Amino acid sequence: MKILVAMSGGVDSTVTAYKLKNLGHEVIGCYMKLHGKPNYHEENIKKVEKVANFLQIPYHILDLQEDFKNKVYMPFVDTYKEGKTPNPCALCNRFIKLGKLLEFAKSLGCEKLATGHYARLENNLIKTAVDESKDQSYFLASADKEALKYLIFPLGEMKKEDVKKFASTIEVLKSFATQKESSEICFVEDTYVQVLDQFMDTKIPGEVLDSSGKVVGKHEGYMHYTIGKRRGFEVRGAHEPHFVLKINPKQNQIIVGTKEELKISEFNLKNINLFIDAKELDCEVKIRYRSKSTPCKVEIYEDKSAKITLKDPVYGLASGQMAVFYDHDKVIASGFIE
């Protein structure tokens, strides 16, 4: 089978390419240039070239910087401007890795696209990985349903420690087993605010309000805050911790309150991404990557919006983040929180 492998220069994509080549597939590597972070690509491309030469496979360098800027980078900036919390990895998977890269794979005549994600596929549904601590099904849940039939995740049945051990047994790949793992957001060096600073003044002080609308303090600029944050703002006369409940970007205000006020029992989605045919769901939902799943009921409307009612309340639901719905270990839907 002719397979395009997304290669980053990391241990996961390297072992993915190695395993598929060893199984006798016709493997082609591809490195994606997504952003212009200084010295980032040169080092990675050297690693990809080293692996490609060792495996005796061809590889391509695909410049997707313009697509990435339009579909991931600027929406990241704009979402923070709107006082919401973006999910760039989910957008990148849908539009870039499982979008533009898949188009490129098809243009080369490849039957499948393989990535080093920790996830599995079964009956055209994404499943959680064997290694729960590294499971990436949450970020893949934004994928177009039609893309799933072209995908392979060879590491889905492996634990990360075994992937590293495997690489360490092969002389040429030993260095990949010990290299530092990449950060979650590839274009963020230290903090997201440093990215925003390139486009706007993020340090404009504003008012802190309590939930009744009373001014109780000051903050250093609304873009420094996300829902649930409890530091970096002043609350006069507070005797218990206060958390960000809401952000009003136009007024440069943040509304704060107690942990109890952070509780949410229902929320809405727009443009639900369904992997099964349904008008309602009785399932579990994750409201952020590292959160535990919570039982819920989902009502889906004609315009693809949805209302979610939670069995137990959650804390710190952030508008702009992705909610992912599971039937046990299978992803059945996803959508961005309004």
From Swiss-Prot:
GO terms classed as biological process: tRNA wobble position uridine thiolation
InterPro entries: MnmA-like, MnmA-like_C, MnmA-like_central, MnmA-like_central_sf, Rossmann-like_a/b/a_fold
Gene3D superfamilies recorded: Adenine nucleotide alpha hydrolases-like domains, HUPs, Translation factors
Reaction catalyzed: S-sulfanyl-L-cysteinyl-[protein] + uridine(34) in tRNA + AH2 + ATP = 2-thiouridine(34) in tRNA + L-cysteinyl-[protein] + A + AMP + diphosphate + H(+)
Entry's transmembrane regions: none
Superkingdom field: Bacteria
Annotated site residues (Interaction with tRNA) in this chain: 117, 321
Alphabetical UniProt keywords: ATP-binding, Cytoplasm, Disulfide bond, Nucleotide-binding, RNA-binding, Transferase, tRNA processing, tRNA-binding
Active-site residues per Swiss-Prot or TrEMBL entry: 92, 186
Gene Ontology molecular function: ATP binding; tRNA binding; tRNA-uridine 2-sulfurtransferase activity
Interaction with tRNA: annotated span: 134-136, 288-289
Disulfide topology: 92-186
Primary enzyme class: transferase
GO cellular component, one term: cytoplasm
Keyword Cytoplasm (UniProt): yes
EC number: 2.8.1.13
Subcellular location field: Cytoplasm
Keyword Plastid: no
Binding residues for ATP: 6-13, 32, 116
Cited function: Catalyzes the 2-thiolation of uridine at the wobble position (U34) of tRNA, leading to the formation of s(2)U34.
NCBIfam families: PRK00143.1 (NF001138), trmU (TIGR00420)
Family statement drawn from the similarity comment of this UniProt entry: Belongs to the MnmA/TRMU family.
Name the UniProt record assigns to this protein: tRNA-specific 2-thiouridylase MnmA
